[in-house]
Swiss-Prot record:
Gene3D superfamilies in UniProt: 3.40.50.2020
Motif (PRPP-binding): 98-110
Any single biological process term in GO: DNA-templated transcription termination
Keyword Oxidoreductase: no
Keyword Cell wall biogenesis/degradation in record: no
Positions of substrate binding: T40, R41, D102, D103, V104, L105, Y106, T107, G108, R109, T110, R135, V159
E.C. number(s) listed in UniProt: 2.4.2.9
Top-level EC class as recorded in UniProt: transferase
CDD domains documented for this protein: PRTases_typeI
Summary of the function given for this chain in its UniProt record: Regulates transcriptional attenuation of the pyrimidine nucleotide (pyr) operon by binding in a uridine-dependent manner to specific sites on pyr mRNA. This disrupts an antiterminator hairpin in the RNA and favors formation of a downstream transcription terminator, leading to a reduced expression of downstream genes. Also displays a weak uracil phosphoribosyltransferase activity which is not physiologically significant.
Swiss-Prot/TrEMBL keywords: Glycosyltransferase, RNA-binding, Transcription, Transcription regulation, Transcription termination, Transferase
Protein name from the UniProt record: Bifunctional protein PyrR
Annotated family: Belongs to the purine/pyrimidine phosphoribosyltransferase family. PyrR subfamily.
Length: 175
């Protein structure tokens, strides 16, 4: 199976910077802005975007994580952990502008699960979505507000995102 590098380290860094600027424009600054990264790689991307926003605005915005494990629609038994344990952030997200961060947007089911987790716990003013890669093939009517790169793929192909924080390198690869 052949691999194609779609984004290298420099491309990922430029993309994170662009997404940070787009989020600031969308929100007209940092007021009431919250970033929630979908575990695991979305968490690292959210932290990178937070760092870029801090460099641009000299303000550190609240950033946390969403664990969608118990909100997925492909598991049979829901756990009692489906409430407050899904979102890990040190501030209330009610009446805030929440941006969900994910590495790859594919069918939309992961995003749907993250929306369920957020709305079970809070009532944000607005929810946006940022994805490093959008590969298409949606099964739900979900669209990202901020996309790093649109990558047309076949359903048989796999898009893998590698991030330094857990993979010791930065790259987006199609297999």
């Amino acid at each position: 199976m052949s691999e194609r590098i779609i984004m290298d380290d420099a491309a990922i860094q430029r993309t994170v910077t662009r997404i940070a600027h787009e989020i600031l424009e969308y929100n007209k600054g940092t007021d009431n802005l919250i970033l929630l990264g979908i575990k695991t790689r979305g968490e690292y991307l959210a932290n990178r975007i937070q760092d870029k926003i801090h460099q641009i605005e000299q303000q550190r915005i609240p950033t946390g994580t969403i664990d969608i494990t118990y909100f997925r629609d492909d598991i049979e038994h829901m756990s009692s952990l489906t409430t407050k344990d899904a979102i890990d952030i040190d501030t209330d997200i009610t009446d805030k502008v929440v941006i969900i961060i994910d590495d790859v947007l594919y069918t939309g089911r992961t995003v749907r699960a993250s929306l369920d987790a957020i709305l079970l716990n809070a009532r944000p003013i607005k929810i946006g979505l940022a994805a490093l890669v959008d590969r298409g093939h949606r099964e739900l009517p979900i669209r990202a507000d901020f996309v790093g790169k649109n990558i047309p793929t076949s359903k048989e192909e796999t898009v893998s995102v590698y991030l330094e924080e857990m993979d010791q390198r930065n790259a987006v690869i199609i297999k």
